[in-house]
Amino acid sequence: MQSLTILGSTGSIGKATLSVIQQHTDKFFVHALVAKNNVAIMTEQCIAMSPKYACMISEDAARILKKNLITAGKYDIEVLSGVMHACELASTNDVDMVMSAIVGIAGLKPTFSALRAGKKILLANKETLVTGGKLFMKEANRYRACILPIDSEHNAIFQNLPEICQKSLGNTSLSECGISRIVLTASGGIFFKTPQKQLTKITPEQACVHPNWSMGRKISVDSATMMNKGLEYIEARHLFNAKPSEIEILLHPQSIVHAMVYYSDGNVLAHLAPPDMRIPIAYAMAYPKRIGLKISSNIDIYYLNKLHFDQLDNCSYPCFQLAIDADNCSQSATIILNAANEIAVEAFLRKMISFTDIPDVIRRVLDAINLNDPNDIEDILYIDQKAREKAISICVI
């Protein structure tokens, strides 16, 4: 049996991971659950899964969790708190694989801890690659960590890669593997056909609905602005060592075809699956083998003639274009982009700014800050903090 630490267990990816584990209790068990401050869900998960450790980033949340577990009779679960303990649980010798699903820059340190311990990392945290992709892929090679992407698009590309590319992720050029380009699909978000003039009136409640996927509030807004796809573009650049000319983004509202790989010999491999995150999670957990999975629906071959594809108009999605521009600029620019976006989205969710203000805030922060590329995690966090401070000052004016 293989043991897991789940970073971000109370979020949508964490819940989906636990769902896969519950279908395969003969193959996997939970060593530790880690979350920020959602005590209610963490309590339920601890009672259901009986991990050896439960860690809350918030000390106050950890105290409440401990009381809840004592009340529930779960005396054998050790409750910890803080980022340091999260890092320890991600790197301990008692763990075979780590699900990195903490949303935002908060997932950076625990994920790097797992990396430096040579773990099998199921990478769902976009920000690790967006903010530290160069450093992360370099150290993945150094510590021989196995990186398996969880985002449906990157997971789909990974499945369509030749074994040599899978085994040397980020180090082998696509052209050397006979690949001419990779294609990521994008649903276009909930406001795909909404006239531009109406976007200023969009509410957080409207933006937090995704047409195909079940996701958290922040990621749902990122999907609506298409920043999510911009971040995925940056991820793909690092994960697959791809040049800008080797990546294409294609609008596909149904989210059935997740990615395509074009080979130089004329072959095109497309990956199709229902929009259910348990599918890429199960693939990554079992890799290089495969395991069965009970899902509510499967692909109906007769439905395929109803699928739609279209070119992406970057002008309609300013957040996406900002991500492309930042990636073309520098690693520090993508750190600033990510930090400014997190603050802008939070401000929108709190109704401090409008939906269409989000790209304006990001653009102003990018224009205001110019720092050297990071050499280590502390540099990343410094640049991130400076960008957040600037974004906050803009949002509260």
Swiss-Prot record:
Q: Which cofactors does this gene product need?
A: Mg(2+); Mn(2+)
Briefly state the protein's biological role. Catalyzes the NADPH-dependent rearrangement and reduction of 1-deoxy-D-xylulose-5-phosphate (DXP) to 2-C-methyl-D-erythritol 4-phosphate (MEP).
Q: In which pathway does it act?
A: Isoprenoid biosynthesis; isopentenyl diphosphate biosynthesis via DXP pathway; isopentenyl diphosphate from 1-deoxy-D-xylulose 5-phosphate: step 1/6
Q: Which UniProt keywords apply?
A: Isoprene biosynthesis, Manganese, Metal-binding, NADP, Oxidoreductase
Give the quaternary structure. Homodimer.
Q: What is this protein called?
A: 1-deoxy-D-xylulose 5-phosphate reductoisomerase
Report the top EC class in one word.
oxidoreductase
Family annotation (HAMAP family): DXP_reductoisom
EC numbers, comma separated:
1.1.1.267
Keyword Phosphoprotein attributed: no
Please name one Pfam family that this protein belongs to. Answer: DXP_reductoisom
Query: Residues that bind Mn(2+), according to the entry?
Result: 151, 153, 232
Which positions bind NADPH? Answer: 10-13, 38, 125, 127, 216
Gene that this polypeptide is encoded by: dxr
The record's listing under NCBIfam families reads: Dxr, PRK05447.1-1
Q: Which reaction does it catalyse?
A: 2-C-methyl-D-erythritol 4-phosphate + NADP(+) = 1-deoxy-D-xylulose 5-phosphate + NADPH + H(+)
**GO MF entry, a single one:** 1-deoxy-D-xylulose-5-phosphate reductoisomerase activity
SUPFAM superfamilies associated with the record: 1-deoxy-D-xylulose-5-phosphate reductoisomerase, C-terminal domain, Glyceraldehyde-3-phosphate dehydrogenase-like, C-terminal domain, NAD(P)-binding Rossmann-fold domains
One biological process term from GO is: isopentenyl diphosphate biosynthetic process, methylerythritol 4-phosphate pathway involved in terpenoid biosynthetic process
Family from the record:
Belongs to the DXR family.
Superkingdom: Bacteria
Tell me which residues bind 1-deoxy-D-xylulose 5-phosphate: 126, 152-153, 187, 210, 223, 228-229, 232
